[in-house]
């Protein structure tokens, strides 16, 4: 227990030292709150009793070597703010991300100090951006002026072409309306001669085809499928045409027989 207590007192005493307090006081002296150095044995609050620590000479024996106090330069190096090293960035630019858009140093973010620099970002003045914007605006303003002022003939041709196209469209629309009136069967002004028949046009057979079909009909009124295929191939007809012709020929023959039977007493 004695060794543990002595080690604990040793670490507390080493942490609460005069050197670190002087450094903290020098660092935050510029702030609004003034910090004063305090003795090592006095606590922060008045509620707690003061702790008394034994001196280093009495607490530790010879085997324990005293701790070397940290130099002010070493401690200051810990809290030293990071500064951008220009020679390193200029020497090796392979690791610089060129796809990031450089921000000017005047841009302030809520998490940064207004007077601090954005480290790792190349500062850029606003003069170059202003010149680029001004040149772009001049180009955009000059283009419509050039196009409008240098081609007066195009302005004159445009209304003429528009007038021609409008007249053509009106004439085409009138022509279409006349055609629709002529083709409309319900229109009262249309003559019955112009009405189109919905019946399909007949496909008359030639004299040679009708002669051969009559011979085949006199030989046999009903054709088999094979014979019908042969007749259609010889006469350059389809099987359906040959079939329909034979059906019509049989109906005609029945009518002729009825007429003969009615005429006979």
Swiss-Prot record:
<dbReference type="Pfam" id="PF00046">
    <property type="entry name" value="Homeodomain"/>
</dbReference>
<dbReference type="GO" id="GO:0000981">
    <property type="term" value="F:DNA-binding transcription factor activity, RNA polymerase II-specific"/>
</dbReference>
<keyword id="KW-0238">DNA-binding</keyword>
<dbReference type="InterPro" id="IPR006711">
    <property type="entry name" value="Hox9_activation_N"/>
</dbReference>
<dbReference type="GO" id="GO:0009954">
    <property type="term" value="P:proximal/distal pattern formation"/>
</dbReference>
<dbReference type="InterPro" id="IPR020479">
    <property type="entry name" value="HD_metazoa"/>
</dbReference>
<dbReference type="InterPro" id="IPR001356">
    <property type="entry name" value="HD"/>
</dbReference>
<dbReference type="Pfam" id="PF04617">
    <property type="entry name" value="Hox9_act"/>
</dbReference>
<feature type="DNA-binding region" description="Homeobox">
    <location>
        <begin position="198"/>
        <end position="257"/>
    </location>
</feature>
<dbReference type="InterPro" id="IPR017970">
    <property type="entry name" value="Homeobox_CS"/>
</dbReference>
<keyword id="KW-0804">Transcription</keyword>
<comment type="function">
    <text>Sequence-specific transcription factor which is part of a developmental regulatory system that provides cells with specific positional identities on the anterior-posterior axis.</text>
</comment>
<dbReference type="GO" id="GO:0006351">
    <property type="term" value="P:DNA-templated transcription"/>
</dbReference>
<keyword id="KW-0539">Nucleus</keyword>
<feature type="region of interest" description="Disordered">
    <location>
        <begin position="163"/>
        <end position="188"/>
    </location>
</feature>
<keyword id="KW-0371">Homeobox</keyword>
<keyword id="KW-0217">Developmental protein</keyword>
<dbReference type="GO" id="GO:0009952">
    <property type="term" value="P:anterior/posterior pattern specification"/>
</dbReference>
<dbReference type="InterPro" id="IPR017112">
    <property type="entry name" value="HXA9/HXB9/HXC9"/>
</dbReference>
<comment type="similarity">
    <text>Belongs to the Abd-B homeobox family.</text>
</comment>
<dbReference type="InterPro" id="IPR009057">
    <property type="entry name" value="Homeodomain-like_sf"/>
</dbReference>
<dbReference type="GO" id="GO:0048704">
    <property type="term" value="P:embryonic skeletal system morphogenesis"/>
</dbReference>
<protein>
    <recommendedName>
        <fullName>Homeobox protein Hox-D9</fullName>
    </recommendedName>
</protein>
<keyword id="KW-0805">Transcription regulation</keyword>
<dbReference type="GO" id="GO:0000978">
    <property type="term" value="F:RNA polymerase II cis-regulatory region sequence-specific DNA binding"/>
</dbReference>
<dbReference type="InterPro" id="IPR050803">
    <property type="entry name" value="Abd-B_homeobox_TF"/>
</dbReference>
<dbReference type="GO" id="GO:0005634">
    <property type="term" value="C:nucleus"/>
</dbReference>
